[in-house]
Structures are given as structure tokens and as C-alpha cells.
Amino acid sequence: MNIQEPEHITMVRDSVRRLLDEIATPAHAAQWDKDDRIPRDLILPLAKLGLCGMAVPEEYGGHGIDIRGVLAVIEELAKRSAVLSGLYIANTIYGSFNINASGSPTQKQFFLPKLANGELLFAYGLSEPNVGADLTGVQTRAERRGDKVIINGAKRWCSGADTNDYIYALVRSDKSEDRRKNLSILLIPRATKGITITTTNTMGQRGVSTCDVSFDDVELPFEETVLGGETGWNKGWTLLAGPTLEAEKVQVPAMAVGIATAALDEAWQYAQERKQFGVRICAHQSVRHMLVDAKTKLLACKLMLHHCTELVAENKPAAIEVSMAKLYVAETCVQIVMDCQKILGAYGYAEGFQMERLVRDIIVLPIWGGSSAIQKNNIASMYRLPKD
């Protein structure tokens, strides 16, 4: 069964694969994981190839919004390196999509050309030490004082905050009792007085730091900092749940499919090369069944991803389908990678082999972008399933 993609998407995939053979070999990916550091300037050759411009309108120096292309790039990058895929997400999904959808004219003029050129990366500052799934409970506060905004509080699990240029932060900006009407989104330059950033070691996705960020009387210009300027003040929840939400969710299934594809490719090849009991292990029924099950599950994941991509690209309602894809694809791709690890045996467990890294990188995806439990709650609510 073939997934019919537009011809230009096939060309994009081919171009990305050729570029990766130059700038991101398997040895590079292994080294970034070992060092827990990926060079941020790797975004520049992606931009030079025009990949960052697929998230920016032509009038701002891009090639026009192409969600199909962006998600294809995320998938292809993740096959080689999840953290390289993360760099691209920090530029396109976190940066360009949000600013193009909700930024003020001044913000668009300032940010979008730089994002198209690969000059800027954004970190997501939504979660806090005491706030995870319930984002309406954020405690970081922003106070307006004339033409300034003063920020105090803390963010947690803010990937890339120590190296990326801006932090896209959800804050409480008013005392309204309706928790959805007193939130704003701020674009906070990392190198600002009053910001302290510390890092946390993580199991996987090594190369981009996971950070805690604290704000101590951080003072910034109001119009430049509040997403949308004056019209965005106290409209943060509307913007967060707005036109870019589905694109932000579907990037997780795209990364998951990329990682799972890499794992299955390796297991498929290994099973044809490894011999035990006088035959290749792919001749043993148990291994054959594991490989076929993985192939079947991966195709189902790709079909769900493709369906959601088309809905989002055509601006059709996709909230339920995207939540289902986030739930099913993330969970299923974890299963695929874990089964592929079993096929490699000890070689799938030992450091220095790609499979061990793929296992560590995939584990977090059912948590990212809204956990599987939250997706199930959301899906049930969207189907209006009674709670009493």
C-alpha cells in the first residue's frame, strides 16, 4: 500500500536525505548523543536548502506555508537524529507557525525573515514546577507597567532554553477569575537580565538540554514581547488553542514515525544478516512475525499521520483526528522500537549501537505534547461522552 504524496514532497524527502548524508551521518548522531550537545548552527544548512522557509509566507522571505513539507522534514530528520529534528521544530513549529498565525505586524516583520534564514530558534515555556497538563494553572506572572512588562516565576521542561534565542512562554497576566481569560503569551529573549537557566539530564533526546528557567523581575518592552502586541494581552489561551495547535500536536507523530522507521530498517537488515542455528534469524517464525507485526503497525501509523497532515494542510477540522494520531502513533511507535530492540538482542541494548539510542529517544513521545492520558480525556470530551 502506497501513501500518495505530492511530487514536491517526494523531492523534499530526497533532498533532506542527501543533505543528511553530508551533515548528519550516523556517527554524527551518535556523537551528539554522547556529548549531549548538538551544534545549533546545523539549522543553517536546512535553511539554505529552503526547509525553514516552508513555514514562512513569501512576503516575509519564505516559500509559503507548507505543512506537508514541514512534517515530511521532521520525519526524515528524526530517522537520523531526533534532536536534529528538534532543532527544526524549534525554528518552524515553535517559531514561524506561531508568529505567523498570531504575531503583530511588527513582530512578523522582525521575526519571520530571520526564522526563514535559520537565524532564530524558540524554546517552549509552557510547563512549570507545579503545572503540567493543566496549563490554565500557570503561576508565572506578567505585570504591565506602562510600556513595559515585568515577569516573575519559573518554567520547567523548557527544551533548548539554554541555547535557543527566545522562550515562548505562557504567563498569567490578569486577576480574572476565569483562568482562560487572564493568560498571555510572551516572546522572551533568552539573554535578558533576570533570567536564570539550569539544565536537567534526561534519558533520551540527548543533545538539546532540558531546562528550568526562572524569571526575577525581568523587564521587557510590552509591544515587542507580548505575542500579538496589544491585541494579544490576556488572549493567551485563545492563541495557544488557536490555528497552530493541530500542527503542534501532529509534529510528535511525525517524529515518532521517523524514529520507528529507523529502528525497523535496522532490525529488518540485522535479521537478514545475523545467523543462528545455521540459518539467518529472519527464517525463524518468531522473528518473522515480529518484523511483520512491526511493518503493519508502522504502516497504520503512517496512514494516520498522512490523514492528519492532509486535514491540517487543507484547514479542515482535525482536532479529534490529531489527538487520536498523537495518542496512537506515539504509543505504537514505542512498541515498534521496543520489539526491534528485542530482535537485535544484546546489540539493541548496548551503548554504541544505534538501537539503544532510538529506544531512549522514542520513550518520551507519549508524554510530549500532551500525554496519552490527556489525549484520551480530550477525545472523550470532543465526542461528548458523559461524565456522570
Where in the sequence are the language-model features?
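Amphipathic, small/basic residue-rich leader segments at the start of a protein or domain
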Residues: M1-L87, F110, K114-N117, Q335, ...
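Glycine-rich phosphate/cofactor-binding loops in nucleotide/flavin-utilizing enzymes
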Residues: N2, R13, A72-V73, Y94, ...
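C-terminal helix-coil-helix/basic helical segment that borders enzyme active sites and/or dimer interfaces
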Residues: A27-K34, W268, Q272-V279, K295-Y328, ...
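N-terminal glycine-rich flavin-associated loop
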Residues: G86-T106, G132-L135
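A short, Trp-centered hydrophobic/proline-enriched beta-strand micro-motif
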Residues: G118-L126
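A structural signal for short hydrophobic beta-strand segments in well-ordered beta-sheet cores
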Residues: T140-E143
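A short core secondary-structure module
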Residues: K148, N152-T198
